[in-house]
Amino acid sequence: MTDSFYRYDVIVIGAGHAGSEAALAAARTGAHTLLLTHNIETIGAMSCNPAIGGIGKGHLVKEIDALGGAMAHAADAAGIQWRTLNASKGPAVRATRCQADRSLYRAAIRQMIEGQARLNIFQAEVDDLLFEGDTVCGAITHTGLHFKAPAVVLTAGTFLAGKIHIGPTQYAAGRMGDPPATMLAARLRERLLTVARLKTGTPPRIDGRTLNYTAMQEQPGDAPRPTMSFIGNSASHPPQVSCWITQTTERTHEIIRAALHRSPLYSGQIEGTGPRYCPSIEDKVVRFAEKNSHQIFVEPEGLNVIDIYPNGISTSLPFDVQLELVRSIRGFEQAHITRPGYAIEYDFFDPRGLKASLETKAIAGLFFAGQINGTTGYEEAAAQGLLAGLNAARHVRGLSSWTPRRDQAYLGVLVDDLITHGTNEPYRMFTSRAEYRLQLREDNADARLTAIGRDLGLVDDARWAHFNAKQEAVARECGRLSALWATPGNALGREVKETLGVTLSRETNIIDLMKRPELDYAALMRVPSLGPGVDDAQVAEQVEISVKYAGYLNRQSEEITRQQRHEATAIPLEFDYAAVRGLSTEVLQKLQHIQPQTVGQAQRIPGMTPAAISLLLVHLERMRRNRVA
């Protein structure tokens, strides 16, 4: 092999959701990229639940898509059931979710990776990283191959010192059927990085042919179906299926309570903290002892497999207990388990040791993304991966990094939460984490981010053309409607009364008419002189939201502008906080530990006071004047 085989601009380690997006983003922006994975066949694998999207998570997928990422495309190629969650609520909290065929999803991701220019794949376990002082310069495989690169993105998922637990049985693994990255974990622990343990879990898988669906409630998908990608088409979705809903029983809870002493969660065997919002069934039975049943979503794992994912009964109880509790569930009386549920513990690193670019502060050129940063979920991992891959490529070219602000994207909220507050439990995205969620809707992710993505080199010509055509259509339709006026006596006013039963008392612009709670775009388009309107549902939605929520959006924009002063005030990396007179010991220690990159980030550190921020601003201004002088 020639020397060029081993030299790259960016190396990405791990090919799950974070690694796939990282490698694609780096290569799309021009970096010669190597994706190292222990098994090419598991690229893009959905290790736990077979679904993409949901509350907060769907927002992240739309943002990934707006920035040219892969996840939404793969979801559209694999989605076998589609739903819009919170459809009856406001647009800020509506979210798209799809049940996905695991095989189709994995195939879609692999196809995109294999088709990406400047991106090579190599199958190898990575045992160590190469360093020159405090700078990363490559990776060493289990077989001793040395790959060189000035930037490395580590997306190890649950593989770093991973340990599976099923009852008292425990063994080293990255996930069931895959080896852990034990050597790499040990080497990383030797560096100046703060490491801790987290845990997650998964339910037993069931042979769907052994279930009694007549005892369950059918949950069909939505019609018409949404799409995940802004440039997706529901006509390209695979065949659709139903999910089902059932419940645990009092007998289920009795079985679990009687076996708690055998649970690694309660015996002290597991040290890592589990996800608060996706607890195991034994955790739910203990924490919500007053409940007689818990809901279970019965989700098919694909069109051509027998496996069912029983969402809601993640467990690490011994297998004999798993079998008994599964068969106590309504409709599961004859269930055959194909794979046991288990918990897995793994290493993660305190994300407060990261810059906003997701580069580690301790090691130049080393970027972390995904569960290694303390998050849980495919969507959270993929969003971080895209950002880390982009910034790794920019690092190599000597360009400044880019991270969205909290008011620009849920990705910005995610990163800021992690690097400012850290986490001691798996972090999951919710819409409630964002202060500006009316601005950060699923439907406008492209309007927020696609132009930025184009400037960064992430967005290709086809997506850019589609985006511009959509924006022009929205502006054109808003302009058309704003030019139309209805009066009690003119023809349009009479049509409005006859069609909609709305009697006008004065001259009214059609835009103002749409602001009324009882009217929407679709209703107005039934008026002969107004309709039929645009036939693109995305354009119609943008027109309606921009009109109905204009007042709220304008007020939130003004608030964001006020906050921007602090967000734009950078703090030098080598800043000496001890030189700021008047800071309390507590505040000083927090600033020295977190090393915020902007005054805005410093403001969000728990325990930070307005007085401390004022002192910080005064000192920064004094430094600026001294430099000028």
From Swiss-Prot:
One annotated GO molecular function? flavin adenine dinucleotide binding
Asked whether the keyword Transport is assigned, the reply is no
InterPro entries in the cross-refs:
FAD/NAD-bd_sf, GIDA_C_N, MnmG, MnmG-rel, MnmG-rel_CS, MnmG_C, MnmG_C_subdom, MnmG_C_subdom_sf
Look up the record and report any one GO term of the cellular component aspect. cytosol
Q: What is its main location?
A: cytoplasm
**What cofactors are annotated for this protein?**
FAD
Q: Is the keyword NAD assigned to this protein?
A: yes
Locations listed in the record: Cytoplasm
Gene Ontology BP term (one): tRNA methylation
What is its quaternary makeup? Homodimer. Heterotetramer of two MnmE and two MnmG subunits.
What this protein is reported to do is described as:
NAD-binding protein involved in the addition of a carboxymethylaminomethyl (cmnm) group at the wobble position (U34) of certain tRNAs, forming tRNA-cmnm(5)s(2)U34.
UniProt xrefs under HAMAP family: MnmG_GidA
Q: What is this protein called?
A: tRNA uridine 5-carboxymethylaminomethyl modification enzyme MnmG
Which gene name does the record give?
mnmG
